[in-house]
From Swiss-Prot:
MF term (GO), any: carbon-carbon lyase activity
Name listed for the protein in its UniProt record: Phosphomethylpyrimidine synthase
First-tier enzyme category under EC: lyase
Iron keyword on record: yes
Sequence positions that bind substrate: N188, M217, Y246, H282, S302, R303, G304, D343, G344, L345, R346, E382, Y409
Single GO cellular component term: cytosol
Pfam families: ThiC-associated, ThiC_Rad_SAM
Keywords attached to this entry: 4Fe-4S, Iron, Iron-sulfur, Lyase, Metal-binding, S-adenosyl-L-methionine, Thiamine biosynthesis, Zinc
EC number: 4.1.99.17
The species this protein was found in: Coxiella burnetii (strain CbuK_Q154)
Organism ancestry: Bacteria, Pseudomonadati, Pseudomonadota, Gammaproteobacteria, Legionellales
Positions with a binding annotation for [4Fe-4S] cluster: C530, C533, C538
Cofactor(s), names only, from the UniProt record: [4Fe-4S] cluster
Gene designation per UniProt: thiC
Function of the protein: Catalyzes the synthesis of the hydroxymethylpyrimidine phosphate (HMP-P) moiety of thiamine from aminoimidazole ribotide (AIR) in a radical S-adenosyl-L-methionine (SAM)-dependent reaction.
Length: 554
């Protein structure tokens, strides 16, 4: 006992040292600002404000939480400030969906609305022709300007959006997932039986927040699963998701046959008590669908899907996640945990895309959605996978139809199988396309996909690729807050304001590094050219001269 206590104290000390020395997130030319609520005036929504050299500023959606506020001290093991605790204490124990159906706007809903607008309502664009030309094609989506708390309430009530916020995760900053809002990006972290400590997982979490992860899934499969999850939850300002099946399997030492509903149920309750915001539940992998995967090139590639398929065959019984689904709903309702209905039969190769097994499970997901809604539980649906570009639209169309417009959450999809080491690029192409079609949450893919456990650089590259995909989709959809950053960066580029170009970029450090490889001196940051064209062939420089000439003759 003494040895275990000493070890725990040592881990707490290491985490405290890490948080003190490394856990401050900084962005160039930026400061943390807070926007006040109107319905709930005590609400303070954290945003990032970039200051530009010409006096302009840009307010951005910020996933970094208290880590980017130098005025907040983060202590371990207590973790982050318990932002939502006062709201939770003074109201009935209901889900966000239940409140929404009753017509009640919660503080979480107003908080999410303020984040979505990014102070866009304060900026007016007078070029009406440009606005009409670039207004975007939201397809069947309806995106108001501005986005109001009432609109968010209605979207949740209709099942078209979720606000994942377990009552036992008060540290989380409310956010909304749905096709009528900014496209969100999920990052996966977690240890394996071979790697990682508690401190390393917290470091991964903060690193993912730094690069814009809107949600994080803890997919730990090794030892200390519960301890790692507890520490992540206490230090996370974004919703945390898990696959409870992984911990349940650890409890039986990986013996699939020994897994029971009772073991899974207890695991579910334990994780809900800790504060997990959404669970991936592979309840759509049914006995009758398993033979449909026999002719596939890559079989069943979902870890949870393959485990439940094996369990069904070993026991010659139906999937207990399906047969006990209403009991799962009751547990999740008690804590306001959201469903992320797993796509256990998703295609793992282009050859298997859009096959019978995949869409059979999707139909069952739709049936389960309706049961979850009946119990007042929020739900989103997970999707593929490996899909060629020409088949992506069918996935989105069928999901909207089968699942009654519940949020879609996809892994990519990867648009080709030939890019090991570059799967983050191949999948970001598919992610941008399906997000424009209506996908609400994109699970990032890193360069290590199919090859190994990603390191910090892989996490960064995966998130950057997916933030680009999400933003491209927001532009295409015509989200009212999407284009501000593009316009300001383009103006800075045309006016040779190099520092503003760097600071407005998704990755300012890399942009500055690439520029400085050939023109490192400070004087080059004011030059009217870069090393690509030089001073004589810069099109922007020439364009300025053309404008000056036109002004003189007119």
């Amino acid at each position: 006992m003494r040895r275990e206590g000493t070890t725990r104290l040592h881990r707490t000390f290491l985490l405290r040292v890490y948080l003190k020395e490394s856990a401050v997130i900084t962005y160039p030319a930026s400061k943390k600002i807070y926007c006040q609520g109107k319905i709930f005036p005590t609400i303070r929504v954290g945003m990032r404000e970039i200051q530009l050299t010409n006096g302009d500023s840009l307010t951005l959606y910020d996933t970094s939480g208290p880590y980017s506020d130098p005025n907040i001290s983060i202590k371990s093991p207590q973790g982050l400030p318990r932002l939502r605790e006062p709201w939770i204490k003074v109201r009935p124990r209901k889900t966000q969906l239940a409140f929404a159906k009753e017509g009640v706007i919660t503080p979480e809903m107003e908080y999410a609305a303020i984040r979505e607008n990014q102070k866009r309502e304060l900026k007016k664009n007078t070029d009406q022709e440009r606005e009409r030309r670039l207004q975007g094609n939201s397809l069947s989506a309806r995106i108001p300007n501005p986005i109001t708390p009432e609109f968010i309430r209605n979207e949740i009530a209709c099942g078209r959006a979720i606000l994942p916020a377990n009552i036992n995760h008060p540290e989380s900053e409310p956010m909304i997932i749905g096709r009528h809002f900014l496209v969100k990006v999920n990052a996966n972290i977690g240890n394996s039986s071979l790697t990682s400590s508690v401190e390393e997982e917290v470091e991964k979490l903060i690193w993912a927040l730094r690069w814009g992860a809107d949600t994080v899934m803890d997919l730990s499969t090794g030892k200390k699963i519960k301890e790692i999850r507890e520490t992540i939850l206490r230090h996370s300002p974004v919703p945390i998701g898990t696959v409870p099946l992984y911990e349940a399997l650890e409890k039986v030492d990986g013996d699939v046959k020994a897994l029971t509903w009772e073991i899974f149920r207890d695991t579910l309750i334990s994780q809900a008590e800790q504060g997990v915001d959404y669970f991936t539940i592979h309840a759509g992998v049914l006995n009758r669908f398993i033979p449909l995967t026999q002719k596939r090139v890559t079989g069943i590639v979902s870890r949870g899907g393959s485990l439940m398929a094996k369990w069904c065959l070993l026991h010659r019984e139906e999937n207990f996640l399906y047969t006990h689904f209403t009991e799962i709903c009751e547990i999740m309702r008690a804590y306001d945990v959201s469903f992320s209905l797993g796509d256990g039969l998703r295609p793992g190769s282009i050859a298997d895309a859009n096959d019978e097994a995949q869409f059979a499970e999707l139909k069952i997901q739709g049936e389960l959605n309706r049961i979850a809604w009946k119990y007042g539980v929020q739900v989103m649906n997970e999707g593929p996978g490996h899909i060629p570009l020409n088949l992506i639209e069918e996935n989105m169309t069928k999901q909207l139809a089968y699942c009654r417009e519940a949020p879609f959450y996809t892994l990519g999809p990867l648009t080709t199988d030939i890019a090991p080491g570059y799967d983050h690029i191949g999948s970001a192409i598919g992610a941008a396309f399906i997000a424009w079609q209506g996908c609400a949450l994109l699970c990032y893919v890193t360069p290590k996909e199919h090859l190994g456990l990603p390191n910090k650089q892989d996490v960064k590259e995966g998130l950057i690729a997916y933030k680009i995909a999400a933003h491209a989709a927001d532009l295409a959809k015509g989200h009212p807050a999407a284009r501000q950053r593009d316009d300001l960066l383009s103006q800075a580029r045309f006016e040779f304001r190099w520092h503003d170009q760097f600071n407005l970029a998704l990755d300012a450090e890399t942009a500055r590094l690439f520029h400085d490889e050939t023109l490192p001196k400070e004087a080059a940051k004011h030059a009217h050219f870069c090393s690509l064209c030089g001073p004589k062939f810069c099109a922007y420089k020439t364009s300025h001269e053309v404008r000056d000439t036109l002004q003189k003759v007119t």
